[in-house]
Amino acid sequence: MFNYSGLNEECGVFGIWNHPEAAQLTYMGLHSLQHRGQEGAGIVVSDQNELKGERGLGLLTEAINDDQMERLKGYQHAIGHVRYATSGNKGIENIQPFLYHFYDMSVGICHNGNLINAKSLRQNLEKQGAIFHSSSDTEVIMHLIRRSKAPTFEEALKESLRKVKGGFTFAILTKDALYGAVDPNAIRPLVVGKMKDGTYILASETCAIDVLGAEFVQDIHAGEYVVINDKGITVKSYTHHTTTAISAMEYIYFARPDSTIAGKNVHAVRKASGKKLAQESPVNADMVIGVPNSSLSAASGYAEEIGLPYEMGLVKNQYVARTFIQPTQELREQGVRVKLSAVKDIVDGKNIILVDDSIVRGTTIRRIVKMLKDSGANKVHVRIASPEFMFPSFYGIDVSTTAELISASKSPEEIKDYIGADSLAYLSVDGLIESIGLDYDAPYSGLCVESFTGDYPAGLYDYEANYKAHLSHRQKQYISKNKHFFDSEGNLNV
């Protein structure tokens, strides 16, 4: 019932303005964002006369080869994208950046996140005669921009950004400027960096700035867009109807541990969440083990707080071929064992605390528990460094249906039995908020915790009817007992 699959973030975006090796630096930036998308990659370049691009399927090294990079040399400006599909199919027609050539201008555009009203916008645009060349929701905003009556591209962009809903960041390139934009809740991150020679960089995470030796300049905040051109950099607002709600899953799972989001280092946050989890749910054992890689920081925090040794009881194969993750049951059954190995000499005869970042479908953690016990572990106590993942996400994570979520239908006690653990406990929502430590004057201190609370800061829009029709009894119980701050259109409940 619950297939082997981890969570997947769908995209990473990168942009650079005014560097003689723009394409090469974009490639390096995308490489540092590879964890955000492995299904395809692309780069669009500009020299203020023309725009051209290259793209392909697979990891960055597969998608863009040396010959393609050679064709991108000599241009000063660029945007790039790594993709994991949450909207649209996996064909090359959906690999970004998209490049459009119009009679009066050319535009490259790429996007991270999910537009939750893309379906209805697309239907309206098609009724007006718009022709779409992909199934990606990114294409919607380009049609909105071109149909705008605004006098300038920037004004048309602002107008279009006010029409799309969801969690998103955009990187857009014309011959005159590099643009970046963030949704009205800042659900998805976007940062600006500056190199020593004055070159400006846009990126989904600060790790892409650091890898180029650039300095962090600022976060782009909720409802803001940035314009970078030969005159410098300008940050403006396209809407003042904003409520900061940064995705908690960026801290918990998606972002690289060396990245910083809204002033909070990801590794430090994860370690703090592990410490808080140990305070909330201690248990007697011989050692603490983390599930590689995103859970290692939390596991070290748990071990430090509880005063137990932190051991490497699981080893991850960093070089698993992508062909191992196949849509057949037989290969799925082998998936965890190929990716992870238990260290028998470490775990044999021991009582173990196993720390993981989340339980979504339950299949992966079930097989890890079995693997540890098959290797001689006496007891395995599972501790999860986030709350119960009970509600689907519509803002750019590939879990958009209740049926995929084991916590939507099973209690922690039932999940404990299903995964074969000796005990199971989760970090509380309040514990998560405290661990991350944001201090915005907003619900949940400025975090988006929709998957744990069913409270959707950007609303539901096209997803509302199906979401409500498939709510489980357990989800309905949670909603009835807990305050919600946002209505179905993302407005604050007064």
Swiss-Prot record:
Pfam families: GATase_7, Pribosyltran. It catalyses: 5-phospho-beta-D-ribosylamine + L-glutamate + diphosphate = 5-phospho-alpha-D-ribose 1-diphosphate + L-glutamine + H2O. Residues 1-10 form a propeptide. InterPro entries: GATase_2_dom, Ntn_hydrolases_N, PRibTrfase_dom, PRTase-like, PurF, PurF_N. Its EC number is 2.4.2.14. The active site is at residue 11. GO terms for molecular function: amidophosphoribosyltransferase activity; magnesium ion binding. Binds 1 Mg(2+) ion per subunit. Mg(2+) binds at residues 294, 356-357. Transmembrane segments: none annotated. Residues 11-231 form the Glutamine amidotransferase type-2 domain. In the C-terminal section; belongs to the purine/pyrimidine phosphoribosyltransferase family. HAMAP family: PurF (MF_01931). This is Amidophosphoribosyltransferase.
